[in-house]
Amino acid sequence: MEPNYVIQCINLTHYYGKKLVYENLNINVAEGRILGLLGKNGAGKSTTINILNGFLEPRSGQCLIYGENTQHLSPATKRRIGYLIEGHVQYSFMNVRQIEKFYSGFYPNWKRDAYFNLINKLKITPHQKISTMSCGQRAQVALGLILAQDPDLLILDDFSLGLDPGYRRLFIDYMREYAKAEKKTVFLTSHIIQDMERLIDDILIMDYNRVLVQSPVRDFTTRFKEFTFELDRDDIELKDHPLAVNVEHLRNHYEFYTYGNENEVRQLLENQGIAYRNFKEQPMTLEDAFIGLTGKY
């Protein structure tokens, strides 16, 4: 059965001046799923976020949210979307309690508990002024205000920016629990891949001009493998073989990244008459897999 897609980006092409960001990019985010967008700096993550929130019009193609073009969203559809962009909070002279009361007057379906549940979880005091908060605390107040609006779709750009490791773990556990319990759809980015791995259902990995992976994160980290081995020489090129997604080596130590299995990699080496030793499959986190797929540099 075809999933119900909340976000659909169809044949997106965009340039900055004459520089191609991506061409004919397609993205689908299914209802009720948490999707994480990963890519190196300059791969097009911010461009995608800006197209989704309507700040930027693609050169060609279109992005749809709930079936409407993001350049022309109706007021009803806009109310279904919560954006967190770098955690900016207006009215920083207010405290935590005052800003909640102020915002609640604009939203008829305001969920006060959603705001204070997050604030209490992160141990932010109700009387603390926004102006005295760290960047990470401000971002969480902004997110609390978004959750209280009860959107169906959350778009979170660098969602854990500025939080220390302990608070990040608290927030991630809370966010996953909240999204599943309330059946929310989430599209997010983060530079901290370990955080993303704990939170997401699906992964989208972009490299320059293209999508490398869009799949359930568990499927990707199960199928994509790293094998290490040592060779007698350090000048053997393996990158051009169809089985190789990426190959890194330092002197005679090789890291071979592939969607193939152990027997296929061993067969490749043996068919080329390459003597090898210390052949191992390495366990991989999402961060390891991302670096293996896109390269270290």
Regions found by a protein language model. Name each.
Residues 154-158, 163:
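Catalytic Walker B motif of ABC-type/P-loop ATPase nucleotide-binding domains
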Residues 85-141:
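ABC-family P-loop ATPase nucleotide-binding domains
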